[in-house]
């Protein structure tokens, strides 16, 4: 806390909030409520950004007008650092194409997490998008589903901007009852299913329905958390 307070004293743009541990989702919601900037960016406590991460992502959003920027990242496992490397080139992606990519691989980091993305705060506030504090799994993905409902264009940034420290975070490693695990998975499946009904027309949804149902299995992968 003292280090953070030092940054706040040195730079008026830094706001530090001292609070009880109310969980990551509630904490993020409080941060969103206090935010005043044009964009929202999230960083997990074990991870770190490259020095130019925010500059690169904001520049991409401002130059293209995209609602979301998604960047490549580095995965850190112990002392090993490797680049994810799935983004081949900088490019603007329309919502229809982006949703198609999500359906092909919903458990991928590029869709499920917050930390390699930049969001427009105006869009978040206009639609009251918040983290679901009742969930302790896939809450990032649910936030992204809600955001993508209203976003129209997305920018893929090939430059890695984030160091993600890989830890065991799947449901198997959390102290959650089996009944609660099933309840959360079903709730997430309903949200996922409802999302695609919203963004696809009826014929397209029927053609893709089996892919949507695969989510119930894919969501158990560790890629979400």
For the regions a language model picked out, list residue spans one by one.
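Nucleotide-sugar donor-binding/catalytic module of glycosyltransferases
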Residues: 1-190, 194, 198
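Active-site anion-handling motifs in enzyme catalytic cores
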Residues: 102, 203, 216
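Secondary-structure edge/capping motif, primarily at the C-terminal ends of alpha-helices
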Residues: 196-200, 223-224
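Flexible helix-coil transition and linker loops at the boundaries of alpha-helical arrays
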Residues: 198-208
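Non-catalytic, C-terminal membrane-associated alpha-helical segments of glycosyltransferases
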Residues: 209-225
């Amino acid at each position: 806390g003292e280090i953070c307070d030092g940054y706040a004293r040195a730079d008026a743009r830094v706001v530090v909030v001292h609070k009880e541990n109310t969980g990551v989702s509630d904490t993020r919601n409080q941060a969103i409520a206090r935010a005043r900037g044009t964009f929202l960016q999230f960083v997990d406590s074990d991870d770190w950004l490259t020095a130019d991460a925010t500059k690169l992502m904001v520049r991409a959003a401002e130059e293209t007008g995209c609602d979301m920027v998604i960047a490549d990242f580095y995965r850190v496992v112990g002392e090993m650092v490797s680049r994810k490397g799935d983004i081949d080139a900088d490019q603007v992606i329309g919502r229809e194409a982006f949703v198609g990519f999500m359906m092909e691989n919903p458990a991928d980091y590029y869709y499920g997490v917050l930390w390699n993305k930049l969001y427009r705060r105006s869009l978040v506030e206009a639609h009251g998008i918040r983290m679901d504090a009742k969930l302790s799994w896939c809450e990032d993905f649910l936030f992204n589903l809600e955001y993508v409902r209203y976003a129209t264009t997305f920018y893929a940034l090939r430059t890695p901007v984030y160091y993600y420290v890989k830890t065991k975070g799947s449901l198997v490693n959390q102290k959650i009852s089996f009944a609660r695990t099933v309840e959360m998975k079903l709730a997430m499946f309903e949200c996922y299913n409802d999302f695609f009904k919203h963004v696809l027309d009826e014929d397209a949804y029927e053609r893709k329905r089996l892919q949507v149902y695969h989510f119930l299995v894919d969501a158990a992968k560790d890629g979400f958390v």
